[in-house]
Amino acid sequence: MRATEKSGSATQYAEDFDGAAQADRPRPPLLVADVSPELQHAVERFLYRQAEILDDRRWDEWLALFTETGKYWAPVTESQTDAEGAPSIFYEDVDLMRVRAKRVSHPRAWSQKPPHRTSHVVGGVVVEKVDAETGDVVVRSKFHMTEFRRDQLRHFAGKYRHHLKKTAAGYRIELQRVDLVNGDGTYDYVIQTWL
């Protein structure tokens, strides 16, 4: 904190932060439309199930959570509004995700000898929008993922934004956006699987 102005004996303070980096970040709405406890619970259960499936390395089940046109996007910065023509940590459609799943589960995948272990924690689940006609929802949440491999522990944290389509089989992911706290940081080795 730094003093910005003095008025008599009172001093007003303003946070000293990197205004340029903060100013261009998109800000999600602070409040949401009223949603039923049942809808909130259904969305939370979906996100918790996704985290458990990822931790168990059940790639086929995880891929089945996506629509056929689904995308998984992890931009480098929160200010990115378009995945096309800009660097991304991940920008994959379902076909590319299938290729990655086969690669990391292949018996000769050196990068997975030994395989990594992960633990996902998802919280702060907020339904931002509900389409009254289709039942589709946009949801934001926070996550923390811990990865352990070869005596190295790595932590990834940030925000998820899911665009979920309501189908006869339940919700399916049309878009999952992952904004890492340290998305523009350096990594000592490549992120092998999804966050």
Predicted regions and their residues:
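Short, low-complexity N-terminal intrinsically disordered segments enriched in polar/charged residues
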Residues: 2-68, 75
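Short beta-strand edge/turn micro-motifs at domain boundaries
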Residues: 2-8, 13-15, 21, 134-140, ...
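Short solvent-exposed loop/turn micro-motifs enriched in small/polar/acidic residues
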Residues: 44-45, 118-120, 157
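Short helix-to-loop capping/linker segments positioned immediately adjacent to catalytic or ligand/cofactor-binding
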Residues: 50-52, 108-115, 150-151
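A solvent-exposed, acidic/Ser-Thr-rich amphipathic alpha-helical stretch
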Residues: 68-139
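A domain-level detector for eukaryotic transcription factor DNA-interaction modules
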Residues: 144
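Catalytic core of tubulin tyrosine ligase-like
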Residues: 147
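Short hydrophobic/aromatic patches at helix-to-coil boundaries
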Residues: 192-195
